[in-house]
């Protein structure tokens, strides 16, 4: 009976974590480049336990046009690299801008990293006359002068590296492996790959799982209490 309570409690924990992930996915439905997270329960029949593991859906989100020359979308594999106070982070969010001192930065002001380090375009800019072009391979040119190359990196372990809206940091640029199977599209952004209908369906199913597990815990706890009462007679 104690074992049954323990297993049901684990199911409650799994349902809670599932609901947290579903809520996060729905909250980021309109977040550029967001990759949905999910939890699945693998039933270990031999041990009679439920193991909860996290997963990241790295599938391509829909691409939409913005006509902003500083918006970039990656089709295929790979992530942009940005330099934060925590080190290098990787992201599919390509809504960039140019800072007052000429750096290409993300929406939080973090410098975008190229193959030669942080990308600074100051010396190539000529006010409103600056014609910024980015090739499919991430080569940045301004007024036909080559200025920098975006560092598009490869990440194999999405689950381990997931950290908030980006993927986790590393302090050493040499840890980064360059991706080759990608294409950069200028003037486009990638939508979140969250499907709201799927998430709502998951929410209903998880709610049912939680209710079932809660009823089982309540039943077993009541049965245990009755057994203890009989033992006192």
Where are these regions (language model features)?
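Amphipathic alpha-helical polymerization modules
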Residues: 1-233
């Amino acid at each position: 009976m104690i074992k049954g309570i323990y297993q049901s409690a684990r199911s409650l924990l799994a349902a809670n974590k599932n609901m947290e992930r579903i809520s996060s996915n729905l909250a980021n439905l309109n977040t550029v480049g967001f990759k949905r997270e999910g939890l699945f329960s693998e039933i270990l029949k031999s041990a009679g336990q439920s193991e909860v593991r996290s997963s990241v859906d790295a599938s391509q989100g829909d691409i939409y046009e913005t006509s902003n020359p500083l918006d970039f979308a990656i089709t295929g594999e790979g992530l942009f690299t940005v330099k934060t106070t925590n080190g290098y982070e990787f992201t599919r969010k390509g809504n960039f801008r140019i800072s007052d001192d000429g750096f290409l930065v993300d929406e939080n002001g973090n410098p975008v990293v190229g193959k030669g380090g942080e990308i600074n375009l100051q010396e190539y800019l000529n006010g409103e006359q600056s014609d910024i072009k980015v090739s499919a391979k991430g080569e940045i040119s301004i007024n036909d002068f080559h200025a920098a190359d975006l560092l598009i990196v490869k990440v194999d372990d999405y689950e381990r590296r997931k950290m908030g809206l980006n993927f986790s940091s590393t302090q050493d640029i040499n840890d980064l492996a360059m991706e080759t199977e990608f294409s950069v599209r200028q003037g486009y952004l990638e939508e979140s790959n969250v499907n709201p209908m799927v998430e709502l369906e998951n929410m209903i199913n998880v709610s049912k799982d939680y209710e079932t597990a809660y009823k089982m815990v309540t039943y077993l706890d009541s049965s245990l209490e009755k057994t203890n009462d009989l033992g006192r007679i």
